[in-house]
Amino acid sequence: MNFDAVADQQMTDRRYFALEVAESDDADSSLNSSSMGSPAVDVGRKVYKITSHKGSAEDESQSFFTSSDSPTSKTRPVGKTIENDDYYGKRSSTGSSLKQLFNKININDTAHSSNKENVSQSVLSENKLLSPSKRLSKQGLTKVTNSKFRTPLRPISNQSTLSRDEPVKDFRSLKFRSGSDFKCWGDEKTSSHVHSSSVNSVNSFTSTTSSSKWKFWKNDNLLSRSLSSRSVNDQDPNFVQPKPTNSLQKKSSISSFHNSIFGGGKHTEKKRNSGFIMPDHQSTKELNHKHSSSNLSFRSLKHKTSHSSLNKLKVRRKGNTQELNHPIKKTCQISLPVPDQVSKDKIQLKLKNSTSLASLSSEVTPINTLDYNDSILQQILQLCDVKYILHDLREAQSLGLFTLNTRSVQLSHNFWQTYHSDMQTSLICKKVCLGALSDLTTSNLISLHELKSLRLIQGTSGVANLLQAYVVPSNQCENDQNLILYLFFKYQGTPLSRCSNIDYSQALSIFWQCSSILYVAESKFQLEHRNLTLDHILIDSKGNVTLIDMKCCRFLNIDNNKASYTRLDHHYFFQGRGTLQFEIYELMRSMLPQPISWATFEPRTNLLWLYHLSSSLLKMAKKAVVSGALNREENILIELTHLLDPARKHSKTIFKKELVIRTCGDLLSLKGEIMQ
């Protein structure tokens, strides 16, 4: 065996180990001092010359190269420093120059208490072989610096750094728990280059920090690259890493920590091979950017699950304006089922028997709004005396029609009193604006309904007789396209709302006249006035009563036997509160069958308006009478009001017949009994 080559290789490795620990300036000074043979002492670094116990270099060489079979020769264990040189044989001649350099290096691993993360103290045994030098004297407690890690430029005394690096020591203790692993490496002699001191320091860290808690997976972004073991990366490639325990396999961040420490890329591998050690803060940044496989899988899963829902939300929010070409909208296609012939027949049969307005048997058909208005206007013109629209009032005068003049007096919002020049008689003119939005109580359809009712009941006593009707443009402004319907009646007196000084006898006369008129119209045409206010009752000088304004009435058309009515579900009829008039509207709607059908004939609605009339007459007569004494007419009027009161409770009598009033005919049949 060539012992010279082995000794030279060990000495060369030991020299590389020492040069890596010492700083460049201190190393140069040490080399200069060793070449001069002077025992240079560096007080700041605590480097002392170690004197040899042997006399000559030849004896050292001979003792170093002693055969391995001799009892005094022992194998130097890997990872232990040299404490006693007496057990080695002869050394080579080339090691004499290196001996002087090693004698100047104090192998000291004593660390300050605030710098525990960089250095460690290892107490060595005297019975173990520590160095390839053969003639070094026996020293007590010789120490070796952790030559694998560079000495920091300034001492680290921050306690947070100590707590940050302690988990790394625990992890290293997991990998290398006992010193037997290192002995196996030395016995196999397969390692090309093993740094014993660094491995020993890691082993010492394991013994001192074995009681610390394992929380390094929570602070993996704070790990220092400087504490990663380079000796592990430089170890034998055939070495099999020990598997982690089952408890650590359950932690998802163990894999990320292992990959960040042992799975370095090409860039970090080049730095390690070149002897460059990355600073702590730079390595921390690199480890901070490395994510574990569990975190990456969780993020990708979260992104996949939320991607489709976000796209659907965008489609709903943005609508059809911005997402016409969206791929999701292209796939969202709805296919409607196509019914067979049997299903079609069933649907048609149900629609024919349906009572809805859109049923197949209904006469209601879809039509354009303009066409609908033109159709209503043509029907109005057919009921007028002039079958076309006049240009202006001058044309009406030329045709001999009644017109409004300067002597006309406005009685109400729509009624005027005028005089004819030839007849010297007064007339009542009703002015209706067709298609105007200002008056919600009128429309083309309502005007048509009123014209039909007037033409139907014309000649009936107590109802205003229509004399003339025609349509003229408004001409209030240049762009005005509204039409005005003029209705002329014979003068029948003034509205009851404007009358004053009415006594109880006159009040009773007005009440019974209105009841008789409604009874005739009710019996003949099934007519319900449905809007008999004081303005729609005219009183002449002789006390005769005339009913006007039939736009809200309901009647039966004799020609086609169909009911004609006006819907009273508009909010205009129910917007008032606190007055008896609007309470009557509510009571009328409650009397109609549910669902509400305004075409149903309900004669009790006329009784409701007679109750409204008796209550109003009772108040008006009290104001006119000065004396406080009650008379007979007043008692009768009070009794009528009580009988027509819809809130009256029917008394249960045995010997007296209960008065049941459901129509105006029933009320008139009780007239003789009430007036007695």
UniProtKB/Swiss-Prot annotation:
Query: Which UniProt keywords are given for this protein, alphabetically ordered?
Result: ATP-binding, Cell cycle, DNA damage, Kinase, Nucleotide-binding, Phosphoprotein, Serine/threonine-protein kinase, Transferase
Q: Which reaction does it catalyse?
A: L-seryl-[protein] + ATP = O-phospho-L-seryl-[protein] + ADP + H(+); L-threonyl-[protein] + ATP = O-phospho-L-threonyl-[protein] + ADP + H(+)
Task: Please state, per the UniProt record, what induces or represses the expression of this protein.
Answer: Absent in G1-arrested cells and accumulates in G2-M.
Q: Where is this motif: KEN box?
A: 116-118
Q: Where is the Protein kinase domain?
A: 383-672
Region annotation (Disordered) maps to: 53-93, 228-312
List where Polar residues composition bias occurs. 62-75, 232-259
Q: Where is this motif: D box?
A: 150-158
Q: Where does ATP bind?
A: 389-397, 430
Give its E.C. classification number: 2.7.11.1
A Pfam family this chain is assigned to: Haspin_kinase
Q: Which SUPFAM superfamilies does the annotation name?
A: Protein kinase-like (PK-like)
Judging by the UniProt lineage, the source's domain of life is: Eukaryota
Spell out the family assignment given in the record's similarity comment: Belongs to the protein kinase superfamily. Ser/Thr protein kinase family. Haspin subfamily.
Domain statement: The KEN and D (destructive) boxes are required for the cell cycle-controlled ALK2 degradation by the anaphase promoting complex (APC) pathway. The protein kinase domain is predicted to be catalytically inactive. However, weak kinase activity was experimentally demonstrated.
Q: What is this protein called?
A: Serine/threonine-protein kinase Haspin homolog ALK2
Native organism is: Saccharomyces cerevisiae (strain ATCC 204508 / S288c) (Baker's yeast)
Q: Give the lineage.
A: Eukaryota, Fungi, Dikarya, Ascomycota, Saccharomycotina
